[in-house]
């Protein structure tokens, strides 16, 4: 089929690769405009943009798909279908109705749970046992269209947003060509989403990344894993040169009792919850400002935290 692919982050790259491998004609790839990245904050293309260019595919990076110019350019592609995977923009009706067979979205949750921008992170932070990937026909509402196919994925005890991202990307990239083949032959069954159990995965904001040690150990653990590796849940630790920001990248819940935020041993067991009733979390991986991510043992060699140290 002649299709357009709309995607931006790393999650979308494998999906585009599978569609190319399946022999579809990629008329155009759409992605978000280049953005400041890295320490130098230089403008760099998105992962999808860079990958598409490496394949010699035409790329457009509009600030908005809502302008008359972009709508007309999209129509002029004369598409059979459009595939959207974490593009990052809302598509208006004129865009959705332009392809002959419609626009289809790969979404990283089991809809209607976790509609919206951050389904992977929110599923872990909420303590969900399972999540998944689904292909749906797009409508004007946010992730409200009928579902064509999907697959469940278990969320393991030490799952992070990063590891779950990779699992879901692998499942989704395999699913997309199968879904498009069914759509092309007219054999795709569309199931309306339930009106019950609707939740929204709000975009992760930097302000919510700081760890609140007064929450229970289970909540702190999910917070850490749900925000790992990006943006990274963080706390401040005392040092000879003042407070140092540390990102906690992996943790597990353990028994322990103490004032919230206080180290219970010299191996990163931190008390959680109010009144000593919240348990504790063991930090398994951490990262200081200006340093790379390190396993706890290596981290402590360069930045020891003794029992009784209060973290903020």
UniProtKB/Swiss-Prot annotation:
PANTHER family: METHIONYL-TRNA FORMYLTRANSFERASE, METHIONYL-TRNA FORMYLTRANSFERASE, MITOCHONDRIAL. It comes from the Bacteria. CDD domains: FMT_core_Met-tRNA-FMT_N (cd08646), Met_tRNA_FMT_C (cd08704). InterPro entries: Fmt (IPR005794), Formyl_trans_C (IPR005793), Formyl_transf_N (IPR002376), Formyl_transf_N_sf (IPR036477), Formyl_transferase-like_C_sf (IPR011034), Met-tRNA-FMT_C (IPR044135), Met-tRNA-FMT_N (IPR041711). One of its GO terms (cellular component) is cytosol. This is Methionyl-tRNA formyltransferase. Its EC number is 2.1.2.9. Belongs to the Fmt family. GO terms for molecular function: methionyl-tRNA formyltransferase activity. Attaches a formyl group to the free amino group of methionyl-tRNA(fMet). The formyl group appears to play a dual role in the initiator identity of N-formylmethionyl-tRNA by promoting its recognition by IF2 and preventing the misappropriation of this tRNA by the elongation apparatus. (6S)-5,6,7,8-tetrahydrofolate binds at residues 109-112. It catalyses: L-methionyl-tRNA(fMet) + (6R)-10-formyltetrahydrofolate = N-formyl-L-methionyl-tRNA(fMet) + (6S)-5,6,7,8-tetrahydrofolate + H(+). Keywords: Protein biosynthesis, Transferase.
């Amino acid at each position: 089929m002649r299709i357009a692919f709309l995607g931006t982050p790393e999650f979308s790259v494998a999906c585009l690769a599978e569609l190319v491998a399946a022999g579809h004609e990629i008329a155009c790839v759409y992605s978000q405009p280049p953005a400041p990245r890295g320490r130098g904050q230089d403008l760099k293309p998105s992962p999808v943009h860079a990958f598409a260019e490496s394949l010699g595919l035409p790329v457009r990076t509009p600030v908005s798909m809502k302008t008359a110019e972009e709508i007309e350019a999209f129509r002029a592609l004369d598409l059979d279908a459009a595939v959207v995977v974490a593009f990052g923009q809302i598509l208006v009706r004129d865009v959705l109705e332009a392809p002959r067979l419609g626009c289809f979205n790969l979404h990283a949750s089991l809809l209607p749970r976790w509609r919206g921008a951050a389904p992977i992170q929110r599923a872990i932070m909420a303590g969900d046992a399972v999540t998944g990937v689904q292909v749906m026909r797009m409508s004007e509402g946010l992730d409200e269209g009928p579902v064509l196919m999907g697959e469940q994925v278990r969320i393991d005890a030490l799952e992070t947003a990063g590891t779950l991202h990779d699992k879901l990307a692998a499942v989704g990239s395999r699913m997309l060509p199968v879904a498009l083949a069914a759509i092309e032959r007219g054999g795709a069954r569309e199931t309306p989403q339930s009106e019950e159990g609707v939740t929204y995965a709000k975009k992760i904001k930097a302000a919510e990344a700081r760890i609140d040690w007064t929450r229970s150990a289970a909540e702190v653990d999910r917070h850490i894993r749900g925000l790992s590796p990006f943006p990274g849940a963080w706390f401040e630790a005392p040092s000879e040169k003042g407070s140092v920001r540390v990102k906690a990248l992996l943790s597990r819940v353990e028994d322990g009792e103490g004032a919230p935020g206080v180290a219970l041993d010299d191996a990163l067991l931190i008390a959680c919850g109010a009144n000593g009733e919240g348990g504790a979390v063991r930090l398994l991986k951490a990262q200081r400002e200006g340093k790379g991510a390190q396993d706890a043992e290596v981290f402590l060699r360069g930045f020891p935290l003794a029992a009784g140290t209060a973290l903020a």
